[in-house]
Design a protein with these regions (language model features):
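Short secondary-structure transition/capping segments
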Residues: 1, 42-46
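A local structural micro-motif
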Residues: 31, 53-54, 81
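Local sequence-structure signature of Cys/Sec-based thiol-disulfide redox active-site neighborhoods
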Residues: 1-29
Length: 85
């Protein structure tokens, strides 16, 4: 079973779209939390990650960071392991 992916995002974020495309190539759909539409969820993201930028991505219970970190996991081959593919 594929790991749950949660992505804090905004509608106009290009890095969010890039992360979504990378996950789509893997056949994985992220559950998106739109922080531009819900300030309480933005506060939650900052509390959980210590970061204010988007995307912020969780795979299972692990905070992996943003798009650059996600792409780095793909380059090293670790993304499939985390996604349980």
């Amino acid at each position: 079973m594929v790991a749950r992916v949660l992505m804090y995002s905004t509608r106009l974020c290009p890095y969010c779209r890039m992360a979504e495309r990378l996950l789509d190539k893997k056949g994985v759909q992220a559950e998106k939390v739109m922080v531009d539409e819900n300030p309480a969820r933005r506060d939650e993201m900052v509390r959980l990650t210590g970061r204010t930028s988007v995307p912020q991505i969780f795979i299972g219970d692990e905070h992996v960071g943003g798009y650059r970190e996600l792409a780095g996991l793909e380059r090293t081959g670790r993304l499939d392991e985390l996604l349980q593919l």
